[in-house]
From Swiss-Prot:
Source organism per UniProt: Enterobacter sp. (strain 638)
Gene Ontology terms for molecular function: ferrochelatase activity; metal ion binding
Cited InterPro entries: Ferrochelatase (IPR001015), Ferrochelatase_AS (IPR019772), Ferrochelatase_C (IPR033644), Ferrochelatase_N (IPR033659)
Protein family according to the UniProt entry: Belongs to the ferrochelatase family.
Signal peptide stretch: none
The protein's annotated pathway: Porphyrin-containing compound metabolism; protoheme biosynthesis; protoheme from protoporphyrin-IX: step 1/1
Function: Catalyzes the ferrous insertion into protoporphyrin IX.
Biological process (GO), any one: heme biosynthetic process
Reactions that this protein is recorded to catalyse: heme b + 2 H(+) = protoporphyrin IX + Fe(2+)
UniProt-recorded name of the protein: Ferrochelatase
Length: 320
């Protein structure tokens, strides 16, 4: 019996199509309308989103995107397309398609792309190393919606996450060591993960534990003493409590306490984007230096590095 033709769906969050208020508004409207992201009752959320948040945030966020926009486009899209191309080159017999939860290319277009190539089994790799209901589960929901009305659906392998995968940890270790070799070993390595509301964790999201799993394996592999590493959470939104400690407040505190040299890595981001290139590399650098620090480096995401691509190859070929 011949083996079913398998395709790979690479999934990520998404990005505006242009660094303009109009494009950012379209993107944020879709992103912030997902109940996996914001679960406030719609009767309360819609007026706030449409009447206050989108009009105020869209122009401001557009300016931030303009500061990091690359010649080829949005950093997240540029690196995601490179990942897609590199993975396809490594797996010539397995079609690869990129799909975003919000914006273009959509997850639906990616699924249609694969099915048009007579794929009978799809391996879904959501490029979020640590599971969260607001990221990985949102991909699951959309995939279920896409397939809900089909008479014939393909076999599905859904990779929940890879927080402690050996090849993922090894790639992070080598990235950190390369930064240490270039800039000197810092007084402290800060591991900054994207935050989620504390309430989501209280209700069962194991994201904080998966972040701790990554941190534990990374610190062990690096051989650093515990006092030279901290784990924090960034990018909080809204007024309710999010996972702590907060990255920005921690960096201010470190500068005030006399820590002079920090390097910051964001292990939860598979590709550099606004939250790493602007929030971490620029905003938080300023917070640390203004508080008394003297040396600050951001360690880039794994992006389309060869080690990262090999990790993807391993995940999609061994977990199906």
């Amino acid at each position: 019996m011949s083996q079913a033709k398998t395709g790979i769906l690479l999934a990520n969050l998404g990005t505006p199509e242009a660094p303009t208020p109009a494009a950012v508004k379209r993107y944020l409207r879709q992103f912030l309308s997902d109940t996996r992201v914001v679960d406030t009752p719609r009767v309360l959320w819609w007026p706030l989103l449409r009447g206050v948040i989108l009009p105020i945030r869209s122009p401001r966020v557009a300016k931030l995107y303009q500061s990091v926009w690359m010649e080829e486009g949005s950093p997240l899209m540029v690196y995601s397309r490179r990942q897609e191309k590199a993975l396809a080159a490594r797996l010539p017999d397995m079609p690869v398609a990129l799909g975003m939860s919000y914006g273009k290319p959509s997850l639906e277009s990616a699924v249609e792309n694969l099915l048009s190539q007579d794929v009978e089994h799809i391996v879904v790799l959501a490029l979020y190393p640590q599971y969260s209901c607001s990221t990985v589960a949102a991909v699951w929901d959309e995939l279920a919606r896409i397939l809900a009305t089909r008479r014939h659906i393909p076999g599905i392998t859904f990779i929940r996450d890879y927080a402690d995968d050996e090849m993922y940890i090894a790639a992070l270790v080598n990235s950190a060591r390369a930064s240490f070799a270039k800039h000197g070993e810092p007084d402290l390595l800060l591991l900054s993960y994207h935050g989620i509301p504390q309430r989501y964790a209280d209700e069962g999201d194991d994201y904080p534990q998966r972040c701790r799993d990554t941190t534990r394996e990374l610190v062990s592999a690096l051989g650093l003493p515990p006092e030279k590493v901290m784990m924090t959470f960034q990018s909080r939104f809204g007024r309710e409590p999010w996972l702590t400690p907060y990255t920005d407040e921690t960096l201010k505190m470190l500068g005030e306490k006399g820590v002079k040299h920090v390097q910051v890595m964001s292990p939860g981001f598979s590709a550099d984007c606004l939250e790493t290139l602007e929030e971490i590399a620029v905003q938080n650098r300023e917070f640390f230096l203004e508080a008394g620090g003297t040396k600050y480096e951001y360690i880039p995401a794994l992006n389309d590095s060869p080690e990262h691509i090999e990790m993807m190859v391993s995940l999609v070929t061994t977990r199906r």
